Amino acid sequence: MKERSALAIARRMAELGEQGHAVTAYTLALADARDRQPDIELEAALYLFEHGGNYKVAYDTFQSLYRRGFQREHLLELMTQAFYLPNVKLLKSRYEKNCRLLRKYPYCFRQDFPAFEDLPLRFYPYDDESYLPFSVKAETFGERLYPRPPAVSRNFFQNLDKPVLAADVYSQYELEYLRDNVRKSEWVGRENHVYLHYTDWGIFCAYLQILSLRPLLEEEKLVFLIEDEISQYPIDFQARFGMDYS
């Protein structure tokens, strides 16, 4: 007798209400179909998602199918309803809180923050530590993003003769690293702020959904330069703000 396929077993177990066995069989069926049979992949992933299977396995499958162009509209709606909308209130609250902080911050010179609904990126939570960024214009998902990777990705201190200048730092961990490892101007007797250059205002604003700025701004070490504001680096704090650190 020919051995029954994992998919056939999964469907039969689902019919009988044997949820645990169906989840196991659908997990095997998904592995068998991966990258080859998108209709079966979707069937299996939906069952796992809706009946207590590993949600990450289902989530990864939804993303994979979407990227491969399979039922994109349906899958985007599914992922939005399941993963984004339950968290949108928190994302919006964090964004608006960070905007309020930057409006009061003396060294953020651009203030035309877009409405939350107009941001170019949406962040779909993946787990407690990571997100999937989604480009609204391109309708594409990027790679998983970890705001707090416990590592520094670059050398911020290549030129010690000038204040630190770093471009497009979107890691909470690295921002806190800079805050903690650059001494205040008052302590070193010269201008020693950390200059953060962001090359795209919309993208910078989008990341305010997932960053926590309050602990970064308290000591006023950071200077935010947006796009062509890079021409202001380094700022003469004595001439502009009346601060003499010598």
Where are these regions (language model features)?
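N-terminal donor/sugar-recognition subdomains of glycan-related enzymes
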Residues: M1-S246
